[in-house]
Amino acid sequence: SDKDDERCTVVILDSVTDPHNVGAILRSADQFGASLVILPERHSANKVNENDVIQRSSAGAASWVPVSVVTNLSRCVEKLKESGFWVYGADAGGVSVADDMFAKKTVLVMGSEGTGISRLLKQQCDSIVSIPTCGKIDSLNVSVATGVLLYEIYRQSVNCT
C-alpha cells in the first residue's frame, strides 16, 4: 500500500541532557519531517512542555513535533525493529552518510556529546553512520549532527519520490 511506501523517521536521543540541544533537535526534526522524537525517562532533558529553554531553542517546534518519553530505550528499539524500522546509530567511526541509502522506515540514534551512544544501544543498531568532515577536531555538536543527518534522510527521500 501507499502507507508502506511513506518515509517515517524516528529520532532517539540517548542521554542528551542539555535542553538547548533537545530544543534545537526538535526544530530540525520539524524542518526535515521526522515523525517522532524519543527520549529516555532518566539522564535526559525530557520535560519538553515545561522547560522554557527547550521551548525557546525549538523556536516553537516543541509544540508540533511528537515526543515520547520511555523508560527503556533498548526495549523501544527492539519494538521499532520488529515493526520494520532500520536503526542507524551516529558515531564518528561509522560509514559515511554520503555512501549510505537510508531505509524508508528509519530510526536515528544520537548519543550524548560526552559518551556517545550507550554500548547496548550501539549493539542494537543495524548500521553506524558518520558525517564526513574536514575539521581538525572531528566532532560536531549533537544538535548540529542530528540536523545534518535528518537533512540527508530528507534529501534522499525527496530524490527518491
Q: Where are the regions that the model predicts?
A:
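Surface-exposed beta-strand edges and their flanking turn/coil or helix-capping segments
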Residues: 26, 81-83, 102, 112, ...
